[in-house]
């Protein structure tokens, strides 16, 4: 995997991060995906922990986990180990010095599908990648 090629990133102007996040979750659900969890990391590292050097400061950091049970079943049927990449995730965050910008990123499902050399897994990953990219495109409107 190549981080610069396989992680898809976009940035969006926003005055209200919480509203952006709500709209983002709605876009995921509109494509027949179920939100399984939203991890609210936010400013947890502002607490000095065990000598960890803080190099990235952020206002908000959300890890959105989601799945479509049919797609999950198809992926697992292609290779039982593909489940280590599930559920799929978006990260939505706002860095401390950019209060009017929301950033979104995800690991392109095609990247993990290439690890398995499975045509059926690649087909499902392509559909998932397209849906995730469509969510990003819709947020730009």
Predicted regions and their residues:
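Short secondary-structure transition/capping segments
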Residues: 10, 15, 78-92, 135-141
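Well-ordered alpha/beta subsegment
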Residues: 105, 112-141
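Ser/Thr-rich, low-complexity intrinsically disordered terminal regions
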Residues: 26-78
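Terminal, regulation- and interaction-focused segments at domain boundaries
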Residues: 1-31
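Short, internal acidic amphipathic alpha-helical interface segments
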Residues: 63-99
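Short, ordered beta-strand-loop transition motifs
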Residues: 2, 56-58, 95-98
